[in-house]
């Protein structure tokens, strides 16, 4: 390595150190980096009291709420699926769909999207049940 290269690198390092110390002094921070990190860690460990609250980042809250909503939709779709497939309580499921103002087509899409799909035979059977239910109980809306 040439001596001019060494001098250039050494000069750049001195300027960098000088710039950092000047910036720290201008910000009125006289502490070294280890002491600053120690203070940051100690401040993070303090327990907040009273009206102060520990706030989670928005992305964390959003993803947790999304997972919760997804789980609820999955459970609801699973319940719909098994009541419609098993010839039990399908009238209750149809009444629930009516109160939520959902059609059978939208309910089948909801179940297929959030749980699993139906075979064509099962869809035909459910449509026949729904038609019979609809004849007995006209749509309230």
Curated annotation (Swiss-Prot):
Signal peptide start-end: 1-19
A GO CC term attached to the entry: extracellular region
Motif (RxLR-dEER): 38-53
Highest taxon of the lineage: Eukaryota
Keyword Signal attributed: yes
Its job: Secreted effector that completely suppresses the host cell death induced by cell death-inducing proteins.
Protein's name according to its UniProt entry: Secreted RxLR effector protein 69
Native species: Plasmopara viticola
